[in-house]
Amino acid sequence: MGTGDGEGYTAEPEPKYGRVMYCDDVAAGPPIWQVEDASRVVDVPLRLIKTKPEDYYVLLVRGNSMIDALIPDGSMVLIRKSDVPEHGKIQVIWIDDRVTLKRMREDEDHGWTLCYEDGTRRTIPLGNKNLIQGDFVAVLPPLSRPYMRGE
């Protein structure tokens, strides 16, 4: 027990990671189904989290349509929740009950187009029923893997 002057007191180290919900796969190619499992989390470096961990989620990328943006198949990506389309940003978009990861482009008529980043210059027009699900933040290090809460 300390004397009140700091003797014998050991400060707890600041956490370096925040637990972020893992939400399964996202397409970097044709849209695929999204399955949320709030019981699975990923430890994410706090330097990547600008607000609180609850404002983020992690997805596993399937496909290579974002390879030129350095987001290859099998990447674990950190996403900040957002529902606002932003020109030039890589975002997660809900299309026909599925999600995909693409770069957003605003057209001259103020419509939106999703752009592949794989050298093909393919695009997908964004309709009124499509919803923005979040903004791409970073590709996580290879050792970042989901685990069950409480492990």
Give the positions of each predicted feature:
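Structural motif
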Residues: G74-S75, K89
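Short beta-alpha junctions and helix-cap segments that line functional grooves
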Residues: G88-Q91, K102
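Flexible, small-/acidic-enriched active-site or ligand-binding loops
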Residues: E117-I124
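A short glycine-leucine-enriched loop at secondary-structure breakpoints
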Residues: D68-P72
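Short, positionally conserved secondary-structure boundary motifs
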Residues: M1-I67, H87, R98-V99, H110-G111, ...
